């Protein structure tokens, strides 16, 4: 129900145009990074109030040269022992903190993104409303290419409405999810961007939730992300996400449980339930398996559990597409294959 309610505007607590860093961590992205830079240069926002930075991270191609020619300020980083996006962001942001750089906030983008012309304007609005960490609306550049890209599109459309919007309307916290998000510069000045898992976005979100800090949601700040076409590449990407999630379980289940007990807030509890979802699913299966059932009975019970688990998202996705006024016909193949996408 909360996902059906339109996001309400907060009153402004300040009215000004803030200065932004647009940061693009990039590893061997010479083929796509210029398109993102061009979309950022076309922002409907005062040009003197944002700078575009590319972190050419352990690149072996011409990412740095292409980005520089496109108009970005390029920082090159070479460190074979620390290769993740989180390390690259911390390396760059520490330099900006030490410089006492004159910025109010920064936005992070993946190199294959295209940014809506009103992105910075809408993030500035969120800053004026008092938000300090805000996730934008993550959409897909290539939703109809094949069933894999369609699966990604349906997943993110569902997350946007059923997770981010619903939680924000309930007074809970959305999560940042990799790209198209904004952070007030002051937030990271005390310690930098310190993350240690493969899913630095989720980790950063959980650390904020543990501190009782709610993240924001900006439905009008849109970024378009390109998704992989091949199953092997998609599998590798989602395996990395799963490993990162497991790392977050190990690192943050106990702190979230302590925060939930001490603060007694729904936001802390919601963060805890999110992080232990994989554990709950595994326990659910073990309860079935350990309930005296074996053979055919166990199989049929699992089928009764799994069928609605995988079919319900199709109906949910169709509802979301209708609410968002998206055409269903081009996505039929993706809808039919969505359970396979989720299960793989």
Regions found by a protein language model. Name each.
Residues 38-49:
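Short, acidic, metal-binding catalytic loop of nucleotide-sugar glycosyltransferases
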Residues 56-64, 79-81, 114:
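A conserved acidic beta->alpha catalytic loop
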Residues 76-99, 118-197, 235, 239-250, ...:
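Long helical/loop segments within the catalytic core of UDP-sugar-dependent glycosyltransferases
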């Amino acid at each position: 129900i909360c996902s059906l309610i339109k996001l309400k505007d907060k009153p402004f607590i300040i009215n000004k145009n803030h200065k932004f860093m647009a940061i693009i961590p990039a590893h061997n992205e010479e083929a796509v990074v210029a398109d993102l830079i061009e979309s950022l240069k076309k922002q409907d926002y005062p040009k003197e109030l944002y700078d575009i930075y590319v972190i050419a991270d352990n690149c072996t191609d011409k990412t740095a040269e292409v980005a520089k020619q496109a108009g970005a300020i390029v920082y090159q980083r070479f460190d074979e022992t620390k290769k993740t996006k989180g390390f690259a962001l911390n390396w760059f942001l520490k330099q900006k903190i030490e410089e006492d750089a004159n910025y109010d906030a920064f936005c992070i983008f993946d190199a294959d993104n295209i940014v809506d012309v009103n992105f910075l304007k809408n993030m500035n609005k969120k800053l004026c409303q008092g938000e300090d960490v805000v996730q934008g609306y993550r959409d897909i550049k290539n939703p109809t290419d094949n069933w894999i890209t369609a699966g990604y599109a349906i997943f993110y459309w569902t997350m946007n409405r059923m997770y981010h919007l619903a939680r924000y309307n309930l007074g809970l916290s959305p999560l940042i999810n990799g790209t198209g998000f904004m952070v007030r510069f002051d937030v990271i000045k005390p310690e930098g961007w310190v993350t240690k898992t493969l899913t630095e976005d989720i980790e950063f979100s959980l650390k904020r939730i543990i501190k009782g800090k709610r993240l924001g949601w900006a439905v009008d700040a849109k970024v378009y992300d390109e998704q992989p076409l091949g199953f092997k590449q998609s599998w590798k990407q989602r395996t990395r996400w799963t490993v990162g999630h497991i790392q977050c379980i190990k690192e943050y289940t106990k702190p979230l449980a302590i925060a939930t007990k001490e603060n007694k807030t729904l936001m802390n509890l919601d963060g805890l339930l999110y992080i232990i979802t994989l554990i709950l699913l595994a326990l659910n299966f073990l309860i079935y398996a350990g309930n005296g059932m074996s053979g055919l009975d166990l199989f049929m019970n699992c089928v009764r559990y799994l069928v609605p688990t995988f079919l319900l998202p199709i109906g949910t996705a169709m509802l979301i597409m209708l609410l968002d006024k998206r055409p269903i016909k081009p996505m039929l193949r993706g809808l039919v294959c969505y359970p396979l996408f989720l299960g793989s």
